Amino acid sequence: MAKLTIALMDSPYESGTTTTAMRIVDAAVRKGHSVNVFAYEGAVSLTMKEQKGHPNPVKGTTIEEAKHPTTANFVAGLLATGKVEWINCGMCVDERGSGDWIEGPRRGGPGDLLKWSEESDNTLIMGTR
């Protein structure tokens, strides 16, 4: 099977880019591939432990009824497959104070992205705009 590296830069809930990336990772894992995710800039907040769901006022549902998935929940599910590795850029974490993560991601730097890119069959960089 192939190994894919994806670099993400968007903060949670800023655009559809993050959702698209998560769906790509999920699809690759379901096909048996391994995926490395390097979170850079605002994407280091995707794994923040204290994210909360919210009610859906359009549908009139409560927090419990809405079952709004957080990016941290989504990432945790991907990591649980054993086919995904996740690195948060340490400089970006420090700049944003985004250090309280779910279990699984590790701290790294741009050199890790380079190493993963060299070892991967394909690399996808998903910028902010």
What are the functions of these language-model segments?
Residues 55-88:
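A glycine-rich helix N-cap at a beta->alpha junction
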Residues 43-56:
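N-terminal beta-loop-helix "entrance" segment that forms/cooperates
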Residues 18-31, 37:
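Histidine-anchored nucleotide/phosphate-binding helix
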Residues 1-5:
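Extreme N-terminal starter segment of soluble prokaryotic enzymes
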Residues 6-19, 35, 41, 47:
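Short, glycine-rich nucleotide/cofactor-binding loops
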Residues 84-129:
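N-terminal glycine-rich phosphate/adenylate-binding segment common to multiple enzyme folds
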